UniProtKB/Swiss-Prot annotation:
Reaction(s) catalysed by this chain's protein: Endonucleolytic cleavage of RNA, removing extra 3' nucleotides from tRNA precursor, generating 3' termini of tRNAs. A 3'-hydroxy group is left at the tRNA terminus and a 5'-phosphoryl group is left at the trailer molecule
Active site: D67
Cofactor mode of binding and number, as noted: Binds 2 Zn(2+) ions.
Protein name: Ribonuclease Z
Main function: Zinc phosphodiesterase, which displays some tRNA 3'-processing endonuclease activity. Probably involved in tRNA maturation, by removing a 3'-trailer from precursor tRNA.
Keywords: Endonuclease, Hydrolase, Metal-binding, Nuclease, tRNA processing, Zinc
Annotated positions binding Zn(2+) 2: D67, H68, D212, H270
Family from the record: Belongs to the RNase Z family.
Pfam family, one: Lactamase_B_2
Source organism per UniProt: Bacillus cereus (strain AH187)
Subunit (UniProt): Homodimer.
InterPro entries: Metallo-B-lactamas, RibonucZ/Hydroxyglut_hydro, RNase_Z/BN
E.C. code: 3.1.26.11
Residue positions binding Zn(2+) 1: H63, H65, H141, D212
Length: 307
């Protein structure tokens, strides 16, 4: 599991930061990539990374401001032109379906893969399978905006190979049957229960990716006990009133959410273009005063998510 930040700016692109898009690489977990927001020129940013459009399985949109969705039509079309045939699902607030369908229709873009568009109308679970559970809550951004909590389900423990070897069980088909929890009988008549040879489960990770938002309780709830919290930091602490007026957060407010939620790690993004060059490091300094395990994203930077 790895984050690749494709765009980390706020509102409009700047020389150093494109607008919002985050790839969550789930290559080891499911051989796929999930995308969170898709601002203008996201597909250009992808060209400079290891992200492959054909592997994008799901796109989660936080809200319908242009800096979060204007890259969608081009990316959806290019995925088809590049030979993508596997299904893709887009999740987002009401209106995302109309935006995509009109853009594709007017441009006569025909995608050659199954495209499903799911409009989120209420809080709660938006996706679940045997590996992941994704839930959402409304944030405070003036228009409907959602934050996402991605919960990886616990992973079965490893087969205790050394224990089996000590008992004289040789590697082979029996190992798989025991790994699957079956009860097997050895040639000498010994009965083995697979459950006795499985180590403790690996706890799944929790990832929280928030859209644009003021400081609010929903952010804390989504981030509770998260292994990684990705939070916007459009403004410095001294501009807290301006952040409130424009439905955004400061770096220190993001750190406060991480602290209150008992998150393990905080990554700041959605940085205003007013912070050019190294001036953005002041945002990082402010956040670390409150929550030490804070990092700040820059375009094309990757962040592995360890277990």
């Amino acid at each position: 599991m790895e984050f690749v930040f494709l765009g980390t700016g706020a509102g409009v692109p700047s020389k150093g930061r494109n607008v919002s898009a985050i790839a969550l690489q789930l290559l080891e977990e499911r051989g796929q990539t999930w995308l969170f927001d898709c601002g203008e020129a996201t597909q250009h940013q992808i060209l400079h990374t290891s992200v492959r459009p054909r592997r994008i399985e799901k796109i989660f949109i936080t809200h319908l401001h242009g800096d979060h969705i204007f890259g969608l039509p081009g990316l959806l079309g290019s995925r088809s032109f590049q030979g993508g045939t596997t299904p893709l699902t887009v999740y987002g607030p009401k209106g995302i379906k109309q935006f995509i369908e009109v853009a594709l229709s007017v441009s006569t873009t025909h995608v050659k893969y199954p495209l499903e568009i799911v409009e989120i109308t209420e809080e709660g679970t938006v996706f679940e399978d045997n590996e992941f559970h994704v839930e959402t809550k409304r944030l405070s951004h003036g228009i409907e905006c959602f934050g996402y909590r991605i919960i990886e389900k616990d992973i079965q423990g490893a087969l205790l190979v050394d224990k089996l070897l000590e008992m004289g069980v040789k590697p082979g088909p029996l190992f798989k049957r025991l790994k699957d929890g079956e009860v097997v009988e050895l040639e000498n008549g010994t009965i083995l229960n697979g459950q006795d040879f499985i180590g403790p489960p690996q706890k799944g990770r929790i990832i929280t990716i928030l859209g644009d938002t003021r400081f609010c309780e929903a952010s804390r709830e989504l981030a509770q006990d998260a292994d990684v919290l990705v939070h916007e930091a459009t403004f410095a602490a001294e501009d807290e009133q301006q952040a409130y007026d424009y439905f955004h957060s400061t770096s220190k407010q993001a750190a406060s959410i991480a602290l209150q939620a008992n998150a393990k790690r905080l990554i700041l993004t959605h940085i205003s273009s007013r912070y050019q060059g190294d001036t953005y490091k002041e945002l990082l300094k402010e956040a670390r005063e409150l929550f030490s395990n804070t990092e700040i994203a820059t375009d094309l930077k990757s962040f592995p998510v360890e277990r």
